[in-house]
Amino acid sequence: EYHVTPNEGKNCLHSGLHGFDKTVFDMGFEGDDTLVLTAASPDGTDGFPGNAELEVRYSLAGAGLMIQYTLTTDAPTVANITNHSYFNLNGHASGSVLGHRLSLAAPAYLETDAGSIPTGRKIAVAGTPMDFTEEKTIGRDINADYPALKQCSGYDHCYVIADSGLRHTAWLTGPETGIRMETLTTQPGVQLYTSNFLKSATACKD
């Protein structure tokens, strides 16, 4: 039995107080188009078993960006490595993204409990404000009187992606620039988060 460090109420968010999100990575390059980042997490860090080694590769491929994660450990453990970037396709300091047009290849999303922890139950998006199977602006339904949205003060939900293998998951367009971003993944879900708890004065980089 293992006890991990709680840092958000009773929950352990982002692997606790010493997760990879708080780690300074070693950096290297492969050729002119690939950045390789590596870091280690010793056995027992914040209660997690196993010596874990993480490699993250950022590669430019034509007009696209590929992110690959590889984590190895010497003991059974829990790992869910992801990317926590934010995108405003209208450009830096261009205001809200609520006018961005979004579509998701997701017929369902995961229900969460009062602590925003998934219960494992899939809820169909059809007929609800959670439905992005047809393109719409992010802001169209974000303030709808719907329990899942009110609980999170917006979108902060794992959408269940149809099919398997490497496939398209999301299409996002900035209305002012016309810039369109498409995302692909091999994973079963994608998290839609509308920065509900970030302060407006949060500093950003160009």
Predicted regions and their residues:
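An exposed, glycine/acidic-rich loop-and-rim segment of catalytic or binding clefts
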Residues: 1-206
